[in-house]
A protein has these predicted regions:
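Active-site and NAD+-binding cores of ADP-ribose-processing enzymes
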Residues: 1-82, 93, 107-219
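Short, well-ordered beta-strand elements within core beta-sheets of diverse protein domains
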Residues: 86-92
Length: 219
């Protein structure tokens, strides 16, 4: 795999400037210790850096968009398709597929929160994936790892791949016609940038419209 990929997150999630400011991994511990003296919320912003082995950590411009996916694992008890208590960078080469995937998950969260109607602003992140090799399961469409809503089998595969130090999994989307990636090691990604803002319009259980916000640009 060697291509640009798109990931969509809530726009309220900020850049973690500490990752951006470190150019040498050896400087991380010192800078973190100094910053934490004056910023009591630093741990919440940075997440659990121990979840990312030192050899896989990335720093510098755009690094926060990558690292946040790994230092902030799921907290809802359900997790993602291939992970439950560790982080994965879910993304797609086709922005439309990334929108379909994130729309499904935002709608499910809002339904379970018993919200009838709302809007949510989202941020599109574009990054470079690879060159790297991922575990390819696109041919296993009849397997239980593709169950629409139950992730047990897929998460078992995710744990096995993580234990084997795999760079991740290449799989078919079940929300749209297209393919997705679940990246398990941060150093497989680079050059992450804010791409644009979207507004998801949610009504009675579904995302009914996706609006590209005027002036958001592509940068």
């Amino acid at each position: 795999v060697n291509e640009s990929v798109y990931r969509i997150i809530l726009s309220r999630y900020p850049q973690i400037h500490l990752f951006e400011r470190v150019s040498n991994p050896q400087d991380w511990d010192v800078l973190y210790a100094v910053e934490s003296l004056t910023n009591p919320r630093l741990r919440d912003e940075v997440g659990d850096i121990r979840l990312v082995p030192p050899e896989d950590r990335v720093y510098g411009d755009g690094a926060s968009w990558i690292m946040a996916a790994f230092t902030h694992p799921p907290v809802d008890g359900r997790g993602g398709r291939f992970n439950r208590d560790f982080g994965i960078y879910y993304c797609a080469a086709d922005e439309a597929v990334a929108i379909a995937e994130s729309s499904y998950h935002r709608a499910r969260f809002l339904r379970e929160s018993r919200i009838d109607k709302t809007t949510q602003e989202m941020r599109v992140i574009r990054a470079q994936l690879g060159p790297t090799t991922l575990h390819d399961v696109r041919h296993l469409l009849e397997d239980a790892i593709y169950d629409l809503d139950h992730y047990g089998e897929a998460q078992q595969l995710g744990y096995a791949l993580r234990d084997a130090k795999s760079f991740g999994v290449h799989y078919q989307s079940v929300r749209a016609q297209g393919e997705c990636y679940g990246v398990m090691r941060a150093r497989a990604l680079s050059d992450a940038i804010h791409w644009r803002y979207l507004r998801y319009h949610y009504d009675q259980g579904a995302i009914v419209n996706v609006e590209s916000l005027d002036g958001s640009g592509r940068r």
